[in-house]
């Protein structure tokens, strides 16, 4: 009984860590999509719902895999394809739906596992280390710890900047709590910094912090490209490769490569149907690779307990779009989450 309680407590703490990053990632991608004319509240709601279903589907019968829209892929689609090329977001949803369904078919063939088996151990380690450095660099840029410079490659920020100060303090606080073997180090550190920055007035709690989820306004709005359909083929193939490569980079960190294509096939299927309600494609998030490699406890439905708790916590955040959007206005807390997960991945990569 004691071991069962410890497993449940460990799963709950891991779920808090994962959801802390996942929720802010969804807010970031929803803000990006809102720049194309897509309503933020609707994009947030359908992304949460798609992430919940995708996480359960990808994790079924295996390890915990968190499914999220990729900030890198969404940024490319928003700035390069929708804004620069003039493709409407409805057409992009249609392309994403076709690409996801094609990916679901291709990843169910017998040759799909060859890609992951072909990756040597050094490449797997390099992918994990690359993901960790990417997250650390993103956190440093968002927190203005590193600044672009016209004279040198980059330059450091100063602690006189409140964003840099609170982010750096939060990272040190999380490291100290983690060194004290406190499992909830990341959520606790993020909560303390969020409270301090709110008390200092760097962000405000909205007058209406909760909002009824808008899950129907984007339903069945996707369309196929209205111009020459052949011109969309390079975009579709590039999107398919990007989705596969980003997910494979996380799956490559797993020791069991034979199971790598099954969660990817299920995730593509979920993404294809999620496009019908207005959600953009999902990938297996890099935070999934930060989890321990030991065998997880599965629930009665065959879903790992950590994945199930993460999905429930994400579902609880469904009406919290205004509150999370306000928190992201001063990105100290998101930067702490990204930096902490990046450090976890760095340690994981060095131990591989």
Give the predicted meaning of each segment.
Residues 1-42, 155-156, 186-261:
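Helix-loop-helix hairpins and the membrane-proximal interhelical loops
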Residues 2-30, 50, 59, 64, ...:
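Helix-loop-helix junctions within the multi-pass membrane cores of secondary transporters/permeases
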Residues 13-16, 34-42, 59-66, 152-163, ...:
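Short, amphipathic, aromatic/basic-enriched membrane-interface segments that mark the entry/exit
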Residues 34-38, 79-88, 114-121, 133-175, ...:
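Inter-helical loop and helix-membrane interface segments of multi-pass membrane transporters/permeases
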Residues 36-56, 262-263:
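Loop-to-helix transition at the N-terminal end of transmembrane alpha-helices
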Residues 71-72, 96-98, 165-172, 185-196, ...:
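Hydrophobic mid-bilayer segments of alpha-helices in multi-pass membrane transport proteins
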Residues 97-106, 137-142, 181-182, 196-208:
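Structural signal for alpha-helical transmembrane segments and their membrane-water exit/capping regions
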Residues 101-118, 141-150, 169-184, 323-324, ...:
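Membrane-water interface regions at transmembrane-helix termini and the short interhelical loops
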């Amino acid at each position: 009984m004691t071991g069962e309680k410890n497993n449940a407590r460990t799963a709950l703490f891991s779920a808090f860590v994962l959801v802390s990053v996942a929720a802010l990632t969804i807010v970031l991608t929803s803000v990006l999509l809102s720049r194309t004319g897509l309503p933020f509240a609707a994009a947030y709601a359908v992304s949460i719902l798609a992430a919940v279903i995708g996480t359960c589907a990808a994790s079924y019968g295996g390890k915990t895999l968190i499914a999220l829209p990729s900030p890198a892929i969404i940024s490319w689609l928003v700035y390069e394809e929708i804004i620069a090329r003039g493709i409407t977001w409805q057409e992009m949803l249609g392309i994403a739906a076709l690409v996801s369904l094609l990916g679901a078919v291709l990843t169910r063939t017998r040759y799909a596992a060859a890609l992951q088996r072909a990756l040597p151990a050094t490449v797997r380690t390099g992918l994990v280390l690359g993901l960790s450095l990417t997250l650390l660099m993103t956190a440093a840029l968002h927190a203005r710890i590193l600044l672009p410079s016209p004279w040198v490659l980059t330059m450091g920020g100063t602690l006189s900047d409140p964003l840099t100060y609170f982010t750096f303090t939060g990272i040190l606080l999380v490291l100290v709590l983690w060194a004290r073997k406190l499992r909830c180090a990341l959520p606790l550190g993020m909560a303390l910094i969020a409270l301090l920055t709110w008390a200092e007035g760097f962000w405000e709690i909205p007058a209406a912090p909760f909002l009824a989820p808008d899950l129907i306004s984007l339903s069945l709005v996707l369309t196929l490209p209205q111009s020459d359909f052949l011109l969309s083929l390079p975009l579709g193939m590039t999107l398919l490769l990007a989705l596969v490569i980003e997910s494979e980079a996380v799956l490559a960190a797993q020791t069991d490569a034979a199971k790598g294509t099954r969660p990817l096939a299920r995730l593509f299927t979920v993404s294809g149907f999620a496009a019908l309600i207005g959600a953009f494609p999902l990938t297996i998030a890099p935070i999934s690779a930060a989890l321990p490699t030991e065998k997880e406890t599965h629930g009665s439905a065959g879903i790992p307990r950590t994945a199930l708790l993460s999905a429930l916590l994400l579902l609880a955040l469904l009406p919290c779009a205004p509150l999370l959007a306000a928190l992201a206005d001063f990105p100290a807390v998101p930067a702490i989450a990204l930096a902490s997960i990046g450090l976890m991945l760095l340690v994981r990569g060095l131990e591989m």
